[in-house]
C-alpha cells in the first residue's frame, strides 16, 4: 500500500511547468458562480491584508499565504493524476488565464504566469491540466477569443461561464495591478 505524504506547496511549485491528468470519472467541471465568487473574495481579502500600493512587485512574495485546501496527486512512472482538487485547480487555472489576459492589455511590467497555465511538451505547448476535450475551449479563453459553445457538453459550457464570472467579480481596483 502506498504511503500518503503531505507537503505545503505554492501555486508556482504545484502548477509551474507541471502536467496533470484527470481521470475520466472526475473530468466534469461543476463549479458554479457562488464557488468562483467565494474563491475570488477569499483571495482578494487575503491579498489586501498585506497589499500596499507603494510595494514593489518583488515584495508580493513576502505576502501571507492562502490555503486552497488539500490537493491529492497520484503519481506513476510517467504521469501525475489529480485524485482530489480538480475543481479548485481548474478554477485556479481559469483565474490565471484571466490574469494573463489582463496583463496582455497593460503596458507595465508583467509577471510571466504562462508556465502556470501551460508548458512545453516536446516543443509543443499544452495545458498543465491535461483534459483533451477542454483544449479548444481553454485555448480560446487563453487567447481572449470567443468560443462557440454550440453542442458542447455541460462541463465546457461551465468552464466558459466560470471564466465570465471571474471577469464579472474580479475587483476593479485590482485590475490595473494584475
Residue ranges: model-predicted function:
Residues 2-178:
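Glycine- and hydrophobic-rich flexible loops that cap the catalytic core of alpha/beta enzyme folds
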Amino acid at each position: 500500500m502506498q504511503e500518503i505524504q503531505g507537503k505545503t506547496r505554492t501555486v508556482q511549485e504545484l502548477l509551474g511547468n507541471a502536467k496533470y491528468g484527470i481521470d475520466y470519472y472526475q473530468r466534469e467541471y461543476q463549479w458554479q458562480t457562488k464557488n468562483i465568487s467565494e474563491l475570488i473574495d477569499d483571495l482578494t481579502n487575503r491579498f489586501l491584508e498585506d497589499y500596499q500600493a507603494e510595494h514593489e512587485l518583488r515584495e508580493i512574495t513576502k505576502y501571507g499565504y492562502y490555503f486552497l485546501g488539500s490537493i491529492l496527486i497520484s503519481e506513476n512512472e510517467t504521469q501525475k493524476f489529480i485524485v482530489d482538487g480538480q475543481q479548485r485547480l481548474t478554477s485556479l487555472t481559469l483565474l490565471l488565464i484571466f490574469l494573463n489576459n489582463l496583463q496582455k492589455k497593460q503596458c507595465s511590467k508583467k509577471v510571466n504566469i504562462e508556465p502556470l497555465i501551460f508548458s512545453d511538451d516536446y516543443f509543443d505547448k499544452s495545458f498543465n491540466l491535461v483534459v483533451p476535450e477542454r483544449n479548444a475551449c481553454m485555448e480560446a479563453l487563453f487567447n481572449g477569443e470567443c468560443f462557440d459553445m454550440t453542442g458542447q457538453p455541460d462541463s465546457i459550457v461551465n468552464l466558459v461561464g466560470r471564466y465570465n464570472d471571474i471577469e464579472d467579480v474580479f475587483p476593479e481596483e485590482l485590475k490595473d495591478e494584475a
